[in-house]
Amino acid sequence: MEEKNNSKLKLTTLAMAQIAVSAALLCVLSPLAIPLPIPVPFTLQVLVVIMIALILKPSYAIIAQLIYTVLGIVGLPVFSGGKSGFGTILSPTGGFIIGFIIASFFVSLVKEKLKIKNSVLRYILSSVIVGIPCIYIPGIAMYMIFVKTDLLTAIVTLTSVFILIDLAKCVIASLIAVPVNKALAKIK
């Protein structure tokens, strides 16, 4: 009986470690931003968000995203460009932060429900078909509100700049997630 309890404790400890490392990755990599002529900079956030979603269970993925978001809201400079505060959520880039939370949960959920295991192609498809829309829809909506532009202009502006790069990030995240998941399977 004791062995079973230790196993549960190990899983709980592993889950906490995965969540902590994921939140830390977001906090370290998200502030790195390359400014662009539009109010949304180039970052590695999509890559990290998708990678986390492909590695963690849905509940763990969303917890990691929420930790990152709360840390940014309370004042740690973890959002793109080292920004922080609730005002960042209420800005042209705020919808993307909301989208990261949504995407991390749904990409992970699709991976789990469809029993996608260590298939780069299936990881890419799930992250592109589910993750990108989950990120872009609230991102475009908030951009429209705060930049005061119409839907078509917002879509063209944001997708023309980011879509190919974000698709590449989904591929890279998938390539990273497969060996990480294989290694984690050996630990469990």
What function would you assign to each model-found segment?
Residues L76-G82, M142-V156:
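Interfacial helix-loop-helix junctions of multi-pass membrane proteins
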Residues A20, A24, V28, M51, ...:
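Generic alpha-helical transmembrane segments of integral inner-membrane proteins
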